[in-house]
């Protein structure tokens, strides 16, 4: 293939949750930090771990606290602080946007940047990558792995090749030597289920996928087969889209709980916290929505998703929570344990369609929401929140 300008970056914050705590407490640097549920409960699970814990002790996300403590008895176990993770993610995105407006967040700890138009102002893409890593390290206190490539796919693959604190370039000419020997599961977008399907076809490496007859892949997987074949060859035409969230059909958030939650009372606390977070994101985006959905997963990974459409558009936590609570009570037995909770609002429209009610309730609530948003924008997410978040069931503000 023709050589290209590797001007697409994927910046990935290393071991993000654990790194946030190490950034806040320098005494934790170099120590095995494990973000998990309360140590006292046998149902607590590991949500994240520092590289010291991963590489030195074999700690993995999803294992129980009991297992992690057995492998790493002297590890530093810390309860999750999702409000801090959101705050640090926002700070990192601000630094990225100092280099280019073309920033597309992919998750809370990684984003793509297109820096092809920044050469005169900031230098070559490699120079931008080095400066970006330096600023995030100095201003936020977190190391990052950055991949550079001619496409989002190759930038993502490059970022995965050197962790932590890596800087890797992956051009089209590098694909046969660097990508093709890798297991097919390491190709961006391939999960365990697709890996199993490909194994039945005798495909175990990315190179084998790249050399497999595309006609057979299309016959077996439809249009996905063609996309898989292209990705294995490093081909990806999708642009970095800073407005990718502008066309979203829903806004939501989900949390893996630090332990098994049992009973409606505990789960409702999490639903309320998520409703507050989703409502704030909806308002920041300038939307209203009508359809509230919840997702629940038990410790055996059985999943439930249900939704309810409201008679009116909303951006308030109260409306979202009431609908989510109704869905919980209607579709989830109280005795059944919960490990993951998600809440979303769909049917989004511009907030200009808001209608006033006869008694001004909507406008009064809107003024209150705006005041709370302004406080959080200025002082951080923890400046004001529900008191119930400080109970043992709270997850966003350190209650657990």
Curated annotation (Swiss-Prot):
Chief location category: cytoplasm
Binding site for Mg(2+): 12, 109
Top-level EC class as recorded in UniProt: transferase
Location of the active site: 110
Catalyzed reaction equations: DNA(n) + a 2'-deoxyribonucleoside 5'-triphosphate = DNA(n+1) + diphosphate
GO CC, alphabetical: cytosol
GO molecular function: damaged DNA binding; DNA-directed DNA polymerase activity; magnesium ion binding
Annotated site (Substrate discrimination): 17
Cofactor comment text: Binds 2 magnesium ions per subunit.
A biological process from GO: DNA-templated DNA replication
Family affiliation: Belongs to the DNA polymerase type-Y family.
HAMAP family per record: DNApol_IV
General function of this protein: Poorly processive, error-prone DNA polymerase involved in untargeted mutagenesis. Copies undamaged DNA at stalled replication forks, which arise in vivo from mismatched or misaligned primer ends. These misaligned primers can be extended by PolIV. Exhibits no 3'-5' exonuclease (proofreading) activity. May be involved in translesional synthesis, in conjunction with the beta clamp from PolIII.
NCBIfam families, sorted: PRK02406.1 (NF002677), PRK03103.1 (NF002848)
Family annotation (PANTHER family): DNA POLYMERASE KAPPA, DNA REPAIR POLYMERASE UMUC / TRANSFERASE FAMILY MEMBER
Protein name (database record): DNA polymerase IV
